[in-house]
């Protein structure tokens, strides 16, 4: 996964082509979340103008499709497929969800996976968020609870980072259609 920042916004195509030639799966993301130690992610993030220029290409590389979403839309596939384990054994629902719910040094990984908290998070829908199910940007947005938590300490709030990506997608989508 390549995070796209102000510094490297012109070289992700080279990395993508290298991965394609070498049959390596590749993902690219311009949603830069605040650092786990200090809230400085916005210093590296692309402006809306910069993001609009490349968002369609990022979406094509990642296979993103614009779809209508009901209030029961499950917002995050990774929460149903994987866990993130920190260097000290902390288990987090994903790499963006900066909150440990267990520790592999003390708990069995299968028990952690089957835990109610993980299941609840993996079934997070638009209606579980504060405003996502009624937002006009909903079909363009990732609605990432991990980014919302990193940005504002509330996984159900509207993430400004996700909102900026959604605006860039909408501007590109409306320009084409």
Question: Could you tell me what each predicted segment is?
Answer:
Residues 1-107:
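Radical SAM enzyme [4Fe-4S]-AdoMet core and its adjacent flexible, acidic
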Residues 96-177:
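Flexible mid-to-C-terminal extensions adjoining Fe-S/redox cofactors in radical SAM and related proteins
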């Amino acid at each position: 996964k390549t995070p796209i920042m102000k510094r490297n916004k012109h070289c992700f195509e080279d990395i993508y082509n290298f991965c394609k030639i070498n049959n390596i799966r590749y993902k690219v993301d311009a949603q830069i979340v605040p650092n786990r130690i200090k809230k400085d992610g916005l210093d590296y993030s692309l402006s809306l103008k910069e993001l609009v220029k490349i968002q369609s290409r990022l979406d094509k590389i990642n296979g993103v499709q614009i779809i209508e979403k009901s209030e029961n839309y499950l917002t995050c596939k990774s929460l149903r497929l994987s866990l993130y384990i920190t260097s000290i054994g902390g288990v987090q629902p994903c790499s963006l969800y900066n909150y440990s719910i267990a520790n592999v040094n003390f708990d069995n990984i299968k028990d952690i996976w089957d835990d109610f908290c993980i299941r609840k998070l993996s079934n997070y829908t638009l209606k579980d968020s504060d405003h996502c199910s009624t937002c006009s940007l909903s079909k363009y947005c990732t609605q990432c609870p991990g980014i919302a938590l990193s940005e504002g300490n509330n996984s159900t709030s509207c993430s400004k980072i996700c909102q900026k990506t959604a605006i860039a997608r909408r501007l590109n989508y409306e320009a084409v259609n």
